[in-house]
Amino acid sequence: METNKPSFQDVLEFVRLFRRKNKLQREIQDVEKKIRDNQKRVLLLDNLSDYIKPGMSVEAIQGIIASMKGDYEDRVDDYIIKNAELSKERREISKKLKAIGELKNGEAKAE
């Protein structure tokens, strides 16, 4: 009867890891969308900067645009780093799930 407890705990751990892996996949997709959105904003600000002419109180407007562009570029960099971290964790969980599956298959064949 006690042999069922570790097996049940193994199943719970497997489910927990599988759910975490799926959550990471959703987060990765969300971060990729944010990267694309912010890259589009950077491009928009580049284009907007091209249209502003000196007669339009350029210094103040270009200063604001430069600041906004820098903020968006920083966000893109932050999202790229976050995405890499999430991908790494997802790969580690995939390896653990595969190892658990192989271990269970090995035990089933031995019986």
Swiss-Prot record:
UniProt GO cellular component terms: cytosol
Pfam families: DUF496
Coiled-coil ranges per UniProt: 14-41
Subcellular location: Cytoplasm
Broad class of where this protein is predominantly found: cytoplasm
Superkingdom, taxonomy of origin: Bacteria
Keyword terms: Coiled coil, Cytoplasm
Its biological purpose: Pole-localizer protein involved in the regulation of several cellular processes.
Family: Belongs to the pole-localizer TmaR family.
PANTHER family found in the cross-reference section: UPF0265 PROTEIN YEEX (PTHR39591:SF1)
Protein name, as recorded: Pole-localizer protein TmaR
Gene, per the UniProt record: tmaR
